[in-house]
């Protein structure tokens, strides 16, 4: 939900970037766009409002790699700030037009949506109304708020409202039954972890209740990208159990 608003409202986006740069006391600003977004999907210009666009590579979760690249690029040269395009649009509206943020940009998609699109929705809009607006074609088995990997499922569509943090609404129907098998020790979760952790070992120690081992294995470094759960052939809820542990620890509960 960043590319669409950036291209549709490029003047506001560029204006917001300039305001942010001025506040930081710099003129060095660049728009970063993932290289895998081809021009056949959407035409990406070379700049917006005179601010250059740079195509960057990397795989999911690309933000982590992007932050590492920026940290290396500006090492010893000063600090940097990474902001979303939609945030820059709202910054421009607030600073130049005096409009407080009362809307947010939401991607509405999924195989139950007839006309997927980016919608600028007022805060507090019922999620069900967004789905109706974009042509809900059949009853979904799952509705996810947020991305397909890191989003959260909801069942109360009438009372679930659009919030500032709502980036996407995905209505999905699948006939697959949920299942999980015993871990086969394939090591795929370790291979895909962008933080270099061993999710399989962390999960084993979590289930044993070995808190010390869990901490030593670096559970606090987990970014909750859920790559481990996605790649697992046994459908183990690796990321889910790690998140539950961290939530309990944060709340002062005994995991």
Where are each of the predicted segments found?
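Active-site gating/interface segments in enzymes
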Residues: 70, 136-184
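Iron-sulfur-cluster electron-transfer modules
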Residues: 1-39, 46-51, 56, 60-62, ...
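Short glycine/threonine-rich loop-to-helix capping motif typified by GTGT followed
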Residues: 38-46, 153-161, 233
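Conserved active-site and cofactor/substrate-binding residues in soluble primary-metabolism enzymes
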Residues: 5-15, 24, 39, 83-90, ...
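Hydrophobic alpha-helical positions that pack around
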Residues: 6, 23-127, 133-138, 147
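Ferredoxin-type iron-sulfur electron-transfer modules in oxidoreductases and energy-metabolism complexes
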Residues: 168-180, 190, 194-230, 234-255
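Structured core elements
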Residues: 107, 118-120, 144, 170, ...
